[in-house]
Amino acid sequence: MFASILGKIPQYSTISSKCSLKECRKVKKVENSDEIGEIIHRDFLDPFCNEYVLIGEEETSLGINYLQFEEEIRTFEIRDSDIIVASYPKAGTTWTQELVWLIGNDLDFKAAEEHLDKRFPHFELCTIVNFAKMTEMLGSTRPEYIGNSINYLRDLEGTRFIKTHLTYNLLPEQILNGNRKPKIIYVMRDPKDVCVSYYHHGRLIQGWRADFQNFSKVFLSEKIMFGSYWKHVLGYWEHRDKPNVLILTYEEMKKDLLSVIRKTAQFLDKKLNENKIPQLLKHLSFESMKNNRAVNQQDKIESRMKHKLVPEQGAFMRSGTSQNYKGEMSEELILKFDEWTKKSISGSSFVTEPIADLYLNTSQKSVPKM
C-alpha cells in the first residue's frame, strides 16, 4: 500500500526539529527492539510520521513531529475565554465538540454548516503528521487550521473553541500554573470501546496497517499515539473539582443527551432557547452527525483514499453505540482489558466511582451520572 511512497525517502530518517532528542529532557525514541516496537515500526510509521517518541515522566507516546512544536505548545497564549474540549482519541470528541460549539454559539445551526475543523480547530493537529512533507510528496496543500493549527488558533479573535488530545501535563503552561482558567470539558468512554473505535479510525484516517490483535497489544502497552488511556483520563480527573473543569462520559451522553446538554450549558453560563432544543437533539443524533459533511470527516477520507494512503474503507462515525466492543473483542481480550483497568486505576479516587464499575463489567448495569 505504501511501497511507492516509502521508496521516496529513508524509512526512519529523523525529521529536523527545534528540539533534538538529545536536547529534550526525558524524551525517548520507541525503538524497534521488542514485539511492540516491531509492530509500531512495521504497521504504524510512514513517511509523514516516521518515529514515535515517549515524552516526559508519563512517557506519553507521540509522533516525532511533536518535537518541532513542543515549545510553541508550552508557551501558547491561553485566554480565560477559551473553551477547550479535551479527550483521548475516539472517546466521543467530535460529538462533544458539536454540542459545545452550538451551545456556545446560541444554537446557530446555519453557522454550524462550516467545517468543524475550522470552527473548532484541533490544537496539536499540525504535530501529528509532517504536513510539509505531505505537501512535498503529494502536491496537495492543507488549510491553515489543519497544516498550521497552532498559528491559526493564535490569530483567532473572540471566543476560541479548541480541541485537544494532549494529556493534561502537556497543556500550555498558563493552564498548568493557573495563570489562565479556560473552560475545559473532558469526555471519556469505556476504554474497550475506545480501542475498537481507535483501531478503525487509525486504519481509515491515519493509514495504520496493524490488525486488531496487534493494535490491541500496542494499545495495552500504552505506546499507541497519545499514550496511556488511563494516565490520560486520570490526569484530567484529578482536576475535576475545579470550577473551570467539567467531566462528561460518552455513556451518559448516549443515555440522556438532554441532561448533558443542560449541564454543559450551565457550565458555559449559556441560556438555552427551549424552542430549539428538539432541533438540537435531532442535529446531534447519530444519523444526523454521520451524514453531516461538516463533522463526518468525509473530505479527509476521500483525500486519503485518492492518494492510496489508507488500507481500509469506511465511515468516520461507525456505530454510535456503547459496548460495541463485545462484537469485536474475544472474552479473553475483554478480561485482559478489565485487569489492565483495575491495575491502572488502583489507588486513585476514580476506583470508587460508579462509572468504574460500568467500565469493568461488574454489577453496575445503569449508566451513572457524573
UniProtKB/Swiss-Prot annotation:
Activity regulation summary: Sulfoluciferin formation is inhibited by the product adenosine 3',5'-bisphosphate.
Positions with a binding annotation for 3'-phosphoadenylyl sulfate: 90-95, 189, 197, 250, 284-289, 316-320
Entry annotation: catalytic residues: H165
Enzyme Commission identifier(s): 2.8.2.-
Reactions it catalyzes: firefly D-luciferin + 3'-phosphoadenylyl sulfate = firefly D-sulfoluciferin + adenosine 3',5'-bisphosphate + H(+); firefly L-luciferin + 3'-phosphoadenylyl sulfate = firefly L-sulfoluciferin + adenosine 3',5'-bisphosphate + H(+)
Domain of life (superkingdom): Eukaryota
Keywords: Transferase
InterPro entries per the UniProt record, alphabetical: P-loop_NTPase, Sulfotransferase_dom
GO molecular function: sulfotransferase activity
Industrial or biotech use: LST may find use as a new tool to modulate existing biotechnological applications of the firefly bioluminescent system.
Other facts noted in the record for this chain: Both D- and L-luciferin stereoisomers are found within the firefly. L-luciferin is the likely biosynthetic precursor to D-luciferin, though D-luciferin is the major stereoisomer by static abundance.
Recorded family membership: Belongs to the sulfotransferase 1 family.
Function field: Catalyzes the production of firefly sulfoluciferin from luciferin using the sulfo-donor 3'-phosphoadenylyl sulfate (PAPS). Is also able to catalyze the reverse reaction, i.e. the adenosine 3',5'-bisphosphate-dependent desulfonation of sulfoluciferin. Can use either D- or L-luciferin stereoisomer as substrate. Sulfoluciferin, which is not a substrate of P.pyralis luciferase, likely serves as a luciferin storage form in fireflies.
Stated name of the protein: Luciferin sulfotransferase
Organism: Photinus pyralis
Lineage: Eukaryota, Metazoa, Ecdysozoa, Arthropoda, Hexapoda
